[in-house]
């Protein structure tokens, strides 16, 4: 006789909620839309992580890198060391504690400060680009100063995240009241293999790249070791961190477009490559041979953003959901259509992309810039 099936209703490995919205005209708006979308998907999280990334929020300091730094357990020795480190390696034009609402429903929040800085390169480091210099210094803080973590490091943008439901984190950082941006991404976390702690909440960020992720990256070990060869080190105890560093390496440092990066993360199966025409077969074989360590295995969906553009993509067989919608200049990506319709009921278009195919939204100014670059190449 077969045994009785045991159902564990509290064991759910298919959760996490993702949302992203960009106004392609560049119009800035508050975080309320992203907050309400995440409230609609509250059942996708369990209160152990929520967060937002916002772009265009610091126009008065838009030419400076905005470092959001988290000090675990309010470690003032760590803060003192970070202050000294930044003074030695950057020109700090302004620094302050990030304003918060102490009445918000969050547990044991750490200390958050923001620093607006420009690089102060010396010696051989003068050979580095400003971006490479900032990445190097962020890695030094995250790996060498205990209890200090740089959670975002781009210009005119910031990440706000922590332990709680997304609406709790939004209330804590006062995102609806204090900030306006032209693009927002958001995440509701349901941790499965890693702890629910403030640094492990999404988004993950390096420079202005941010990633929110639903799923499980079973190739994390291989991805992590490959990225370490290029100076990227994972310190935040979750697999998603590799995605932020991978897009920085591939798109910023190596100059690959989203369309090719999507095929590195989610390439065609070998049996599909075998039946392609010769040109495509050579192309995809070269991608898989050269970038095999950055193939992302497992069930996953990600929304990636940087200044001027955002894209969402799933694994090649869509084991985690993503849906997109458009209304005028607004482009949405989300784990659920219901979240999009909760904030924009009258959509012009709704569609679900194929597995491994990116949904891309760009500022109109960015589209014109890319078109000009393409015409110059041709």
UniProtKB/Swiss-Prot annotation:
- UniProt keywords, alphabetically: Glutamine amidotransferase
Q: Where is the active site?
A: 16
Gene3D superfamilies linked: Glutamine Phosphoribosylpyrophosphate, subunit 1, domain 1
Q: Does the keyword Ribosomal protein apply?
A: no
Residues in Glutamine amidotransferase type-2 domain copies: 16-378
Any Pfam family hit:
GATase_2
Keyword match ATP-binding: no
Which superkingdom is the protein from? Archaea
Name of the protein this chain belongs to:
Uncharacterized protein AF_0952
